[in-house]
């Protein structure tokens, strides 16, 4: 009885416990890592140029350009976006 129970638990439980984490581990890791990397990469790339463009426009427009050109840029930027 004991030998059968032990063998049954070891054979029945170990493969189940071993298979479930192994199957869920890489599957969830791949599913989570892929969308996270894809989502984070474009967000970082999109945000960095936008911030740089805004900062350059804000710095250059008031110093080098007149307020009339500022208004035109403000109107064009939201239209493009």
Curated annotation (Swiss-Prot):
Residues 46-81 are annotated as: Disordered. Residues 51-73 have a biased composition (Basic residues). This is Uncharacterized protein 046L. The lineage of its organism: Viruses, Varidnaviria, Bamfordvirae, Nucleocytoviricota, Megaviricetes.
């Amino acid at each position: 009885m004991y030998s059968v129970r032990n063998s049954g638990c070891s054979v029945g439980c170990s493969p189940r416990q071993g298979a479930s984490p192994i199957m869920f581990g890489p599957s969830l890791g791949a599913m989570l890592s892929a969308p996270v990397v894809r989502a984070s990469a474009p967000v970082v790339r999109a945000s960095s140029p936008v911030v740089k463009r805004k900062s350059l426009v804000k710095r250059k427009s008031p110093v080098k350009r007149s307020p009339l050109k500022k208004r035109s840029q403000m109107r064009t930027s939201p239209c493009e976006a």
